[in-house]
């Protein structure tokens, strides 16, 4: 997917946890240990936490000068870290409410600037509720439920679908172990 966007001169952002930076940096480097050297990847790597920072530097980039809305593709490694949805933190005396990383990603990268596509990667998804999955999916449709509702071609909204799925799962999980089967869940 990255190569496809790169071949069309599109700008690519990879957001990853700090511990994965070296992996992503190796894949775009001229290092001998780069297994994808011939692909000549070109993308920008930032940490998930960089979204909340307004100053300082990250991997040689001045964060004050980054145009977050200029990326055609954002690849989110360990995307389950964005499962909690949008929240704004405020204190009683706080005149400057702060958006969490999820809202920073949505507002600064996905919604602003060029039309941005989202590729979410997670080998070990940690979803505690169906709402966690819904929040991740919302990144792909810019948090605008009407967009996905129009495409679903169902009588239920995306919110209703996830609410019903959670209710069905809750009923199933309350069953005795002997009755908690895949068939019982799908019925």
What are the language-model segments listed below?
Residues 1-110, 114, 120, 144-187:
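SF2 helicase/translocase NTPase motor core
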Residues 123-125:
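Conserved active-site segment of CheY-like receiver
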